[in-house]
Swiss-Prot record:
It comes from Rhizobium johnstonii (strain DSM 114642 / LMG 32736 / 3841). This is Ribonuclease HII. The lineage of its organism: Bacteria, Pseudomonadati, Pseudomonadota, Alphaproteobacteria, Hyphomicrobiales. It catalyses: Endonucleolytic cleavage to 5'-phosphomonoester. Its main location: cytoplasm. GO terms for biological process: DNA replication, removal of RNA primer; mismatch repair. One of its GO terms (molecular function) is manganese ion binding. The gene is rnhB.
Amino acid sequence: MKPRTPPDSPLLFDTAPLVPDFRLELKARKAGHWPVAGADEAGRGPLAGPVVAAAVILDPKRIPEGLNDSKQLSAQRREELFVQILATATVSIASSSSTRIDETDIRKASLDAMRRAICSLAIPASYVLTDGLDVPPGLDCPGQAVVKGDARSVSIAAASIVAKVTRDRMMARAHSVFPDYGFAAHVGYGTAQHRAGIERHGPCSLHRMSFRPLRKTENGPETDELLSE
């Protein structure tokens, strides 16, 4: 006899993509918290460049259509939504440089950037939804960490888009200073092109020397601080 799935339970192997909505924000509002900010970061995995965090408070009456996890969107669609988010929402952006990442670690640097983004919002948040497992310490308001939050909350999705587009633009500028690594193409991730550039030229000042692939390489070209924190 075939086992039955309980009527109110999702299929165990349901792989349908999540679609972000405003339910978590409305739940916080019902509990007395308003406004609600979503926060996310971009750039935890690359071998070079900063980690960038964004915090976004959406206007419930002007939510851009098509918000989703930035990784599920084309570069062109991210750029389009980026413009719409900046025009309709309260947005704050912060970053932690590769130097800060090396001095602490990527988790601490990411949470610090997220904390600074949240605390710099022009309209103080009463509650924060963050993507992942952690709420940054040191906030002036309570918050909730949401696993796969950028696919569940439109506020977090908006923050993921702002962080991703901002970081991609920063790495495009870095490419003009360090053209030997191909930053404009891979934005610092460990692609074959990037690793070949490191092998030929050594790392530059934007590389994260604490990351395992770079720990044994010699210092290459340096420059003044290119990307402000």
